[in-house]
Amino acid sequence: MFSPFSNDLFVFDIANNHQGSVDHGINIIKEFGKVAKEKNVKCIFKFQFRDLATLIHPEFINSTENKHIKRFTSTKLKVEDYQILLDEVKNQGLLSMCTPFDEKSVDRISEMGFDFIKVASCCATDWPLLKKISEAFMPTVISTGGLKIKEIDNLVSFFNHKGNDFALMHCVSVYPSEDNELSLNQIDLFKNRYSKIPIGWSTHEHPYNTTAVAIAKSKGASLFERHVGLNTEEISLNLYSSTPEQAGEWIDSYISASKMCGDGLNRTHPENEQHSLEILKRGVYLKDDIEMGEYLTKDKVFFAMPLQENQLDSGTWNEKIEVRKSLKINDPILKNSIKIPDNNKGHKILKEAIHEIKALLNEASIVLNSEFDIEFSHHYGKEKFFKVGTFIVNCINRDYCKKILVQLPGQKHPVHYHLKKEETFQVLYGCLETITEGQRRTLHPGQTLLIQPGVWHSFWSDQGCVFEEVSTTHFNNDSIYNDKKINDMKREDRKTTATNWGRFTIND
């Protein structure tokens, strides 16, 4: 499903910096449209709507005691004026957003066709207004300045319940915010606590601070908001609004941080990096002459730089390597002069798999106690475990049974059914692809699949998956496969079992 928050977004908030002038507002939009095009980033231009007749009590409409009331009334624009500005936003190829401060403004935003609606921090506990905003069913961005975590939990629960597509912005409502007030670690908290929701950074720090946006990007923020405007001979910006030049530097800092952070996937290693490591490695050399057929035991070798071309390195050496020809003292051990044994290759593969499985469980934040058994299903042999099989943690097996299963990336479990067992899968992490009785279904975290006795099924994962199996009592030899070769195998040939992680029981 398409999400309006699928790309990183930059929000330029004009607020009242148009100063009540349509012409000045158009100039601001044009200048920041140039910034968006030059930096080639996806930008949103944001307005603020206030229906002053209903927002401000009639007895206070001319008050000078509250600086905001005076500011709002002195920069007031008509609806037609905002339409002109919105049309210019579209002409510049920018997306549009607006913050309502009253219910009537919500209707106006919806009628004018804005792309996004914004909840200001000061309105984030205004439940009559929040309910009205949720009923607009527009993509919603929620600022959280000054809110307690319980209040943010309430917001998340409410907008989830209403079915709104929304994002949260960590925000500090101090104008301007000093460095020691930014609390950027809140982004980490939000990312962990609200893992399925896009998280952003709504910033009021000084415009010359371009470090904060880089930190926010590195912590996983995907929306970035600043107040913007233009200085003129008559108009001076406040201390937390950016000029086009400052906004460009702000985005440059984001771009630089993006390059430094990478894409978050397993990184590829450039050839020059590999070369720089190779020339620092130690090669394996002989302490004394050695005859063909002897083994490279520790007393016969030493490790030293440089590592020569095609030479065995110290990390690959083991005492079971056999020499295929006679060699002299100080000779390098070249790979074409040795025979590396492949006995116990299957067990080595399983031990390698354990490391990857532990990492996947850690990534999924799944904690096991010290009392469990593990089971490798390797239907076509240990050597093919990474392609065909599954890893099982046996937790409980009584009248009921619980297992945790791990599918490594690209690993498939063959088609089979159970004679007695009824089971339900529930995905804890990643995605599980399943086929039951010929029907394919993709399971995401939290989703379940019931499999009754006699139902043919298979499963696999493209990127890796951890899922729970809750079932009736497990019985050995209860699985029937559609491959006769697997059915004909003894259980001990297609299963390797161990206590805990198999320490000292799965041998090299």
Q: In which residue ranges do the predicted regions lie?
A:
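Catalytic cores and adjacent flexible loops of soluble metabolic enzymes
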Residues: 1-351
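Short acidic-glycine-tyrosine-enriched beta hairpin
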Residues: 424, 438-456
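A short, N-terminal "cap"/entry segment at the start of jelly-roll beta-barrel domains
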Residues: 343-400, 492-508
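Double-stranded beta-helix
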Residues: 462-508
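Glycine- and acidic-residue-biased ligand/ion/polar-headgroup-sensing regions
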Residues: 408-409, 419-437
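Conserved short histidine dyad/triad with adjacent acidic residue
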Residues: 386-388, 403-419
